[in-house]
């Protein structure tokens, strides 16, 4: 299992738009075989940083998800919403592996 941890820098005047965008991604990740661990939106402290994470069984499974997502109307619409809405100023992705005891 691999987990992608995302760190977003947002336009703080467009947090509601980002929240809507995030709510749309969660079922898409699940639809295509991933586990979405949720989004964390600004509350106290920095008002422009959000986090999210999701997992897939392997990097190959994630790549298959990406290909299927590009062919999915809801996936394409969400990508377009982010482009036109400009609520995400930057995004960092870090891939992590779980340590089990």
Residue ranges, per PLM feature:
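Short beta-strand-to-loop capping motifs
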Residues: 7-12, 54-58
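An amphipathic, aromatic/His-enriched active-site/gating alpha helix that lines ligand/cofactor pockets
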Residues: 20-37, 55-92
């Amino acid at each position: 299992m691999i987990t992608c941890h995302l760190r977003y820098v947002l336009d703080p005047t467009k947090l509601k738009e980002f929240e809507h965008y995030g709510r749309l991604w969660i079922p898409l990740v699940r639809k295509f075989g991933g586990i979405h661990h949720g989004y964390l939106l600004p509350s106290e402290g920095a008002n422009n940083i959000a986090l999210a994470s999701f997992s897939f069984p392997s990097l190959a499974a994630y790549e298959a998800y990406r290909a299927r997502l590009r062919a999915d109307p809801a996936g394409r619409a969400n990508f377009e919403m982010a482009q036109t809405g400009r609520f995400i100023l930057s995004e960092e992705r870090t891939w992590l592996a779980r340590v089990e005891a």
